[in-house]
Amino acid sequence: MTNEGIKVGLDMARLCRSVLLEKKLKPDYLEQLDPDKLFSVCEYHCLTAMVCMALEYNRITPDAKWAEARAKSIRKNMLLDAERAQITAFLEQEHIWYMPLKGSLLKEFYPRAGMRQMSDNDILFDASKRKTVTHFMKNRGYHLKGDNGAHCDEWLKEPVYNFEMHLNLFTPGQDKTGYFEKTKERLVRVDEKRYEYRFTDEDFYIYMVAHAHKHYRGGGTGFRTLADFYIFLDKKEESLNFAYITAELEKLGMADFEQLMRNTAQHFFSERMQLSEEEQNAVKFMLGAGTYGNLDNLIKKTGKMLNADSKAEYLIRRFFPTMEWWNYYFPKTIDHPVLVIPYFFYRIGRMLTVRRKRNIDELKIILKKNEREFRAK
C-alpha cells in the first residue's frame, strides 16, 4: 500500500472513530480531506455509509454519491432483515434449528441504522435439512452462486439479496482442531422461538475472533472488522467471562490474536488513540486489505498451502489441484472420483468467465513476483 493510500485509509479510519465516539475532528484537518479518494477507499472497505454519517456529523455536506451510498445501505439492511424473517419463519415451520450469524447481529449494536453496511446475511442451520432448504430457496426465486459449497450454499436473488446458508461455521480445512464441529452443543435457544438458537456472548466473541483470524491470516481483513471488535466490546466487555474465552482460544491457538485485536480496537477508539508499534502495523495491514482481503496476501497464503517453491510450480498446482482439493470443494468427488473430469472443465469455464478478472489479476501479480519471494515463504 502506498503512503498516499495509507493516508487516505487513516482519514477513513479517523472519520469512523469520530462518529462512533461522537468526537468532532478539527476544521483544519477536515479541510485537507480528498472526498473522491476517500470515497474509493470507503467502498473498498464497505464503509461508505458510516463515513457519510461521519462527514455529516462533522458538518460537511457530502455530495450525491455519498448520500446515495448511505440510502442504499439503509434500504439493503431493511430488505435483508425482512427477507431473513421470511426465511427463518420457514425454518420454524419446518422444525429446522437455525442461528443467524455475524453482521446481522452486530449491526444492531451500531448507534445508527445502516451504519454497518451488509453485503449478505449468514444463517447456520441443521445440515441434515439441506435439501428442504434448497427446495425452499429455489421456489423463492434464488439461484446458487456456483456449485453447492463444502460448508455453505450462497443464494442470490435480485435486486440485492444474498444469503449464505451454512452447514458448518468453517470448512474442515479451516477448523483443523475440530473445535466448531460441536457448535450445536454450545448454543442456547432464543426464548420466544422454538428453533432459533444463539451463542452465549462469550461463544459469539470466540466465533468472531476465529472468523477474523481466518481472514487476517489469509487474504487479510479490512478496517470494518476492527470497528466490529470495538462496537461489540464496548457493549459487552464488562459482562464477558474472559477466563473462559482465553482458555477456549488457547485451544484454537488464537489467544494472542484476540489480545492484539482487542488492544488495537480499544486503543484506536480511545480518547487519546495511543497505539503500540504492533497495533499500528495491524491497523495499516487492515487498511490495505479491504473488506474481504487483498489478493496479494491471498497468493502468499496459497503459495504456502501449495508448498510452491517457484512461479511455475504455483501455477501448475493452481491449474491442476490435488484430489484432496477436489474432495474439499466438490464433495461429490469423494464417492465418485470420475466426476473430477466434468468438474475440471466446469472450473475452467468459470475461470474464463465468472472469475476471469480475478484470475487475470492473480496471474499479473504472480508474473511480477520474483522467484525469491516464493522460496522465502
Which residue stretches match the model-derived regions?
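Conserved NTP-donor binding/palm subdomain of two-metal-ion nucleotidyltransferases/polymerases, i.e.
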Residues: 1-119, 125-377
